[in-house]
């Protein structure tokens, strides 16, 4: 069976318009269980829009999204959480007046995941939130809010995890640490799609990347190969990444 046939997510000829602007213009790709796929490209290339359509925040205007063999395009976000898709956001939006622990409890209740519930205590320990578990989310620094956003998604036991700029604002030590956590999640069989501008981080964690421009794929393969492509180097990643 080919990797594409084994995919947990398949996006085919996806279109998303905002007025006359085509944010996605025939985008197609797939991801298999246990794979970390990076979506890269300049601002406005369609990376976050793709995540928003896959997660049910936006309905597609054309094309198809298939998750685990069933059409998922246009399905409401909370229903997709039940089916096994969850995500983080560029700017985390926790319930600021609730404690860290309560935020995760709300995510569990909202997600309604089947199977054994993820241990909140384990998540707090694993993602360095144990010491602030009973403090309001408003008290957290930016890195802690990112980790809370991630733990809320993980609490619902997703089979497909979408990470939108998770690394932004993290220091080098934090980046190395979270890279290890993401790779460990993939090792359990979780499929992960990463939208990110930090190419060093993408290189560290991804198995494969899709480079987008104007809502279309212009390259698919490893980042190591991408940085040798003149079009990718000059227009999307910047020439310094070729060295």
Tell me the role of every PLM-derived stretch:
Residues 2-243:
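Glycine-rich phosphate-binding loops of nucleotide-dependent enzymes
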């Amino acid at each position: 069976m080919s990797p594409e046939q084994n995919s947990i997510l398949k996006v085919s000829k996806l279109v998303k318009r905002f007025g006359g602007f085509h944010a996605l213009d025939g985008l197609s790709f797939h991801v298999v269980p246990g794979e970390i796929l990076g979506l890269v490209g300049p601002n406005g290339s369609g990376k976050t829009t793709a995540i928003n359509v896959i997660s049910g925040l936006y309905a597609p205007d054309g094309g198809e999204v298939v998750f685990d063999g069933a059409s998922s395009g246009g399905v409401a976000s909370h229903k997709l959480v039940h089916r096994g898709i969850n995500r983080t956001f560029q700017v985390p939006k926790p319930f600021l007046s609730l404690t860290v622990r309560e935020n995760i409890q709300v995510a569990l209740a909202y997600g309604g995941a089947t199977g054994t519930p993820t241990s909140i205590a384990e998540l707090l320990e694993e993602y360095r939130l144990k010491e602030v578990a009973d403090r309001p989310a408003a008290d957290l620094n930016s890195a802690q809010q990112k980790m809370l956003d991630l733990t809320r998604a993980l609490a619902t036991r997703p089979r497909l995890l979408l990470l939108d700029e998770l690394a932004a604002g993290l220091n080098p030590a934090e980046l190395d640490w979270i890279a290890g956590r993401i790779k460990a999640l993939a090792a359990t069989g979780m499929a992960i799609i990463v939208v990110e501008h930090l190419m060093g981080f993408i290189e560290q964690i991804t198995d494969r990347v899709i480079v987008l421009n104007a809502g279309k794929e212009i390259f698919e393969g490893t980042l190591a190969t991408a940085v040798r492509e003149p079009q990718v180097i000059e227009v999307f990643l910047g020439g310094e990444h070729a060295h």
